[in-house]
Regions:
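Intrinsic disorder/low-complexity segments
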Residues: 5, 17, 59-62, 67, ...
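Extreme N-terminal leader/activation tails
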Residues: 1-30, 35, 164-167
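Homeobox/homeodomain signature
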Residues: 1, 5, 40, 53, ...
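Positively charged, aromatic-enriched nucleic acid-contacting surfaces
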Residues: 49-101, 106-128
């Protein structure tokens, strides 16, 4: 797959794969249509949906890793263009998209994996550096039964919502 053509679900997946310093596991929710991650980004735990292609809250994890970001003037109607260097990136990269967010995310994936990536590995997986290893259904069930992630904050919660029981 060409990184310049990634959109939606595939772009979300490859951004999660590119954040190997943040994401420990990738899962799929909503009948396999949405990327969900387990990880900790600089001390902030995350356990839930991860949709940077449609959410600046999720895309902020990429923006925070930009060491240099240059936004170019739009040359085509509706097209955004950026040039960026990222922490841990291999080189200065360019990204284009129908929005600045998509251009930024494509540039980030290109900085980690180059101009092309494989198809989405559509099963639960654990990240070890840039490698993804499938997690068996049994391992996923054992984690859920053990409750190791039950008390982690959800990114869907509201700021200031401590989720305490009403008095």
């Amino acid at each position: 797959m060409n990184v310049a053509d990634l959109t939606g679900f595939a772009l979300d997946y490859w951004v999660a794969r590119s954040l190997h310093d943040f994401v420990r596991e990738i899962h799929f929710t909503d009948s396999g249509e949405t990327v969900s991650i387990v990880g900790s980004d600089r001390g902030r735990p995350w356990d839930g949906r991860f949709t940077p292609s449609t959410s600046w809250e999720a895309a902020a994890a990429v923006l925070e890793r930009a060491q240099r970001l240059e936004v170019r003037e739009r040359t085509d109607p509706g097209a955004a263009h950026c040039v960026a260097d990222f922490e841990g990136g291999r080189r200065t990269v360019e990204g284009r998209g129908d929005s600045l967010r998509v251009a930024l995310l494509r540039a980030f994936v290109a900085s980690r994996f180059g101009d092309s990536v494989d198809d989405v590995l559509h099963e639960a997986q654990r990240l070890t550096g840039e490698r993804a290893e499938p997690i068996s259904d049994r391992q996923v069930d054992e984690q859920e039964a053990g409750g190791s992630f039950q008390n982690m904050p959800s990114p869907d919660g509201q700021i200031g919502d401590i989720r305490s029981e009403p008095r």
